[in-house]
Amino acid sequence: MPEFVTFSRNVFIPVTNICRNLCGYCTFRRDAGHPEAHLMSMSEIRPILERGEKAGCTEALFVFGEYAEEVPEYLLELEKLGYSTTVEYVADLCKLAIEIGLLPHTNAGILNRKELEILKPLNISMGLMLETTAELKAHSESPGKKPSTRIEMIRTAGKLKIPFTTGILVGIGETKDDRKRSLNTIADIHKEFGHIQEVIIQNFMPKPDTPMADHAPPSKEEMIDTVAIAREILPSDVAVQVAPNLIDPYSLIKAGASDLGGISPTTIDWINPEAEWPDVIELQKMIKEIELRERLPIYPQHIKKGWYSNNLSYLIETLTDKNGFKRKQR
């Protein structure tokens, strides 16, 4: 059992749910003509960030559908906001978050090297789920879920020294050997570049009105087994993360998990909207006798390495304690 388990406090901003991919399990994505399709404006986003900062959050999690620019209707909406590319808009949203006092973490799907270089100075960390190295039916209509494409981006982030979150999705048609291959791929990338902070072991949850609505989720035993395999395969400086709003974490902590990810006191989980976040008191009850320790969206080892830009130095100095974790409020 670990001495302590970590989490971060975030505000979850679903900037757009328009996406070029059509994954078999996703309820986040909307077609451009759907009444729930959106591109949030800065005036909508600012008060959400401000509420999060007042609630003690340290992370602004910006989530996007992938390459929405491929959808003409989205481009028109983006141009109304005064931008020609999503990355330009993300950069300004990150600046806004920093101004308010939050550390940006962007997960926008596939980004090329130039786009990562633009966002690196304005993000404390970034993320992209590998999901799996297997070619699956669930991803047959999702060009951005091609394993080689995702691996290339994770490697590019390593070359640029961007602290990074990735992970696998368990139960979408992959085999146990596929999971091992995926985890070994992540481990090899980290051994080369040293940038992967955490690997999420996320359990598939069937959603109504999706092609995989009747697909069974992984059992608790499968999840325990996968976490144990992850802890065995991954280097010791890479945390194994599980989502406490999707599964009871205690047995997974016993198997090797040590992080509970981002928890929001002010926003919902827009990817799994049916799964409410536990609050910090509930989190502590879930993990029983283990110490719960709050971290930032950058891990202490990457703070010590100085893997962040001058744009973020003041917030790092303000928010961290001497060990690189979240400074306790007095």
Swiss-Prot record:
UniProt domain Radical SAM core: residue ranges: 5-245
Family membership: Belongs to the radical SAM superfamily. CofG family.
Binding site for [4Fe-4S] cluster: 19, 23, 26
EC number from the UniProt entry: 4.3.1.32
Biological role stated in the UniProt entry: Catalyzes the radical-mediated synthesis of 7,8-didemethyl-8-hydroxy-5-deazariboflavin from 5-amino-5-(4-hydroxybenzyl)-6-(D-ribitylimino)-5,6-dihydrouracil.
UniProt-listed SUPFAM superfamilies: Radical SAM enzymes
Catalysed conversion reaction: 5-amino-5-(4-hydroxybenzyl)-6-(D-ribitylimino)-5,6-dihydrouracil + S-adenosyl-L-methionine = 7,8-didemethyl-8-hydroxy-5-deazariboflavin + 5'-deoxyadenosine + L-methionine + NH4(+) + H(+)
Disulfide pairings: none
GO MF annotation, one: 7,8-didemethyl-8-hydroxy-5-deazariboflavin synthase activity
Name of the molecule in the record: 7,8-didemethyl-8-hydroxy-5-deazariboflavin synthase
Pathway(s) the chain acts in: Cofactor biosynthesis; coenzyme F0 biosynthesis
Quaternary structure, from the entry: Consists of two subunits, CofG and CofH.
